[in-house]
Amino acid sequence: MAVDLESLLQRYVMFLLHQKGLSGETYRAYHNDMNHLMSFLRERGGEEISKETVRSYMLKLHTTYSRATINRKLSAIKGFFDFIIRQGALEANPFSHVRSLKNPGSLPRFLTPDEVFDLIDATKNSRDRAILELLYSTGIRVGEVEAMNCYDVDMTAGFVLVTGKGKKQRRVPVGRRAQAAIRMYLRERGIDDPIYSRDPLFLNSRGKRITTRSIRWIVSKWSTQAALSRQVSPHVIRHSFATHMLDSGADLRSIQEMLGHASLSTTQRYTHLTVDKLMDVYDKAHPRAKEE
């Protein structure tokens, strides 16, 4: 298979970014996945991909990564070789016979409401508090926070405009506490009404748009400061938002819309958490639930 994979990879990542409209976070993940494969091929002395090469690479993945990460990498690789076929440089996808791994059905980790409150109360500056309040108030993704501009926040209507995967936009309600935290932070920057500002919503210490890496670091830093018993990430806060909403009676369709899930089945993971809670309450409270 004498094809210039490196050159085709550059064309593929540009295709993902400009034509497929992948979010920055997903684009970077796919790009890193393909670079991982390229590095593996270079270590083997070239870019020729045989069945043995595919088997060796998949074995390497199985000994290093989780099922979810392996499936994501496999999806990126299959998409890349399908792209090469469409370009006329290959006749068959060398990874087409490799099946995705079944998800064991692990439930998302989440914080209790008290843990979330402790996390937010531990913050010592207005920007970080506004970020944490926004994450928990809306359940949006870390990459969506990074991409937000000031004019995406409508204080009057109580909504934020979120640009999600595939450049799809949705309006998500934002609570009063999050609004107040954002307003305080923006006023420190001299912005009274965000709807009239085209600046990034959150800035780093150099006055540039904050990155997803920085947001993750902020969440981790304050979770340590709050002495929480588990490591916290923006995604854990997102799971906490969904779980708390469902526990409080919100319907699945509304949660799906707020989270930006394309499929309701993705949102339905949270129903398992609520069922577990209901069973626990039932076992403790119902007179006929206890064993004699």
Listing of model-derived features with the role each one plays in the protein:
Residues 1-292:
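Conserved catalytic core of the tyrosine transesterase superfamily
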